Amino acid sequence: MRASGILMPVFSLPGPFGIGTLGAEAFAFVDFLARARQTYWQILPIGPTGYGDSPYQSFSAFAGNPYFIDYRVLAEDGWLTPDEVPAPVPVGTVDYGALYNERPAILKRAADRLLAEPSKAYTDFCAAQDFWLDDYALFMALKAEQGQAGLADWPDALRTREPSALAAARVRLADAVDYHKAVQFFFFTQWSALKTYANQKGIQLVGDIPIYVSPDSSDLWTRPELFQTDGQVHLTQVAGCPPDAFAADGQLWGNPLYDWPRHEAEHFAWWKRRMKHATSIYDVVRIDHFRGFESYYSIPAGNTTAAGGKWVKGPDRAFIDAMHEALGQGGIIAEDLGYLTPEVKTMLTASGYPGMKIMQFAFDSREPGNYLPYTYTRNSVVYTGTHDNVTTEGWRATASPEDVHYACRYLRCTPKDLTEAMIAACLSCVSDMAIIPMADWLHLGAEARINTPSTQGSNWQWRLTTPLTSLLADHIADLTVLYDRAPAAE
């Protein structure tokens, strides 16, 4: 079935608390999507973030980001008093440093009220999430006690989970552990309310999970035997990408690599649990770097570049079969961008999952024809660009004149109309699903770029300051109906 949606990170929503939250503005965005006759709201990973602020480097593969908790909703639920809700601040880019300094004290007031007389909803939540929640809360409490040091720099007894050290920590840090559990309860209570509302409005939430966990994560700390470590929770090999025309030294991501034989011996139980959790909070799940299941680039830990790595065979079809067994065959989007071998393409075909198409990549005048829309297949998801691309207006301003000319010739438009023409090309193409970034519908320039890969500084900070009008929603709806992507009218 043909359908469409909009890519909009939660942190990019407007709102009064310095970052997008799960409050009124998120519900208003659902209303906008419904009026625009959309089916999907695609977001970025929603886990807690640390140094660098990347949602793809989270402290947990299961937890939610405390920054997204809406204070107004906490007040409505009785966990904050009205005068404890901070005064509104103007909508600007996300200041993660300010959030780091200001949020914990406010959330602690709410947590203290909850913990003074825990509700049945809270105890039920803790019981349902016990497969990750206790370890995550203890990890975060220990991390604070260690001055926010990374896991690799913790004392040996704590890093390696020596039983006596953990038992003492659970007593010593009991209040902090309870705080982190309460915060997760607040997050998932608000998330559940938003998802319920979205689904009632006919909007499905498309989540995003990184293939790898962070080297500073409760996941690695809790189950180091599932990763390529030395037995002391130090990494032996790390993830990345090999050198190519765009990066002479490759990309050194530094994430832990999975010990796939161990996962296979356990029938991929950890991954099944991860994916079942993801499919419980999202309607559709995009898996980042899907090709890494077929083979992955392995770099010796301690290397300063990715140049010394090598490709290693992954679980391939065994993983796909395990996911089919646990989840069925739908509800997954495979991010299959980058270096694809015939083996990767065979694995993707066997999975039945749709891959991704990026319209901006179609118009490389040096390699004409490779990624043009006529090459797309129905079982795919097409984007003008993703969070890793500049906006289409930004692309028009920064791409080579030859590329812009090529795009305009193909799309039969002038440079001034290129963004709208590229959106129309996405909506009209054969791909079953089309996702357009919100910034492209607004014709915003490079200032609205979400992330520039392999850089630090101003990523993950863009927020929406342009009003989403009924006029824009009706324009989107008109094109959605025109290209037969609108849901059936009730």
Task: For every predicted segment, state its role.
Residues 1-37:
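Mature N-terminal, pre-catalytic/accessory segment of carbohydrate-active enzymes
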Residues 9, 53-184, 188, 213-435, ...:
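Alpha-amylase-like alpha-glycosidases and glucanotransferases acting on alpha-linked glucans and related
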Residues 24-31, 189-197, 271-273, 418-422:
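Short alpha-helical segments and helix-capping/turn motifs at coil-helix boundaries
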Residues 24-49, 277-282:
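Catalytic domains of carbohydrate-active enzymes, especially glycoside hydrolases
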Residues 34, 191-199, 324, 348-349:
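Surface-exposed amphipathic alpha-helices with a cationic face
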Residues 35, 158-159, 165, 462, ...:
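Domain-scale activation on soluble regions of proteins
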Residues 44, 204-206, 210, 284, ...:
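Outer-envelope exported proteins of Gram-negative bacteria
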Residues 180-213:
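Conserved, well-ordered alpha-helix/loop/beta-strand core segments that scaffold catalytic motifs
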